[in-house]
From Swiss-Prot:
Organism, scientific name: Clover yellow edge phytoplasma
Disulfide pairings: none
Presence of keyword Ribonucleoprotein: yes
Function: Protein S19 forms a complex with S13 that binds strongly to the 16S ribosomal RNA.
Source species, domain of life: Bacteria
Gene designation: rpsS
Cleaved signal peptide residues: none
Family as reported in the entry's similarity comment: Belongs to the universal ribosomal protein uS19 family.
A GO cellular component annotation in the UniProt record: ribosome
A GO molecular function held by the record: rRNA binding
Name recorded for this polypeptide: Small ribosomal subunit protein uS19
Length: 12
Protein backbone atom coordinates (compact mmCIF):
# COMPACT_ATOMS: atom_id res chain seq x y z
CA UNK A 1 0.00 0.00 0.00
CA UNK A 2 1.08 3.57 -0.72
CA UNK A 3 -0.57 5.78 1.88
CA UNK A 4 1.79 8.66 1.08
CA UNK A 5 1.03 8.53 -2.65
CA UNK A 6 -2.64 7.76 -2.05
CA UNK A 7 -2.99 10.97 -0.06
CA UNK A 8 -1.27 13.01 -2.77
CA UNK A 9 -3.38 11.67 -5.65
CA UNK A 10 -6.58 10.71 -3.80
CA UNK A 11 -8.50 10.03 -7.02
CA UNK A 12 -10.47 6.86 -6.31
Amino acid sequence: GHAKKDKKIQKK
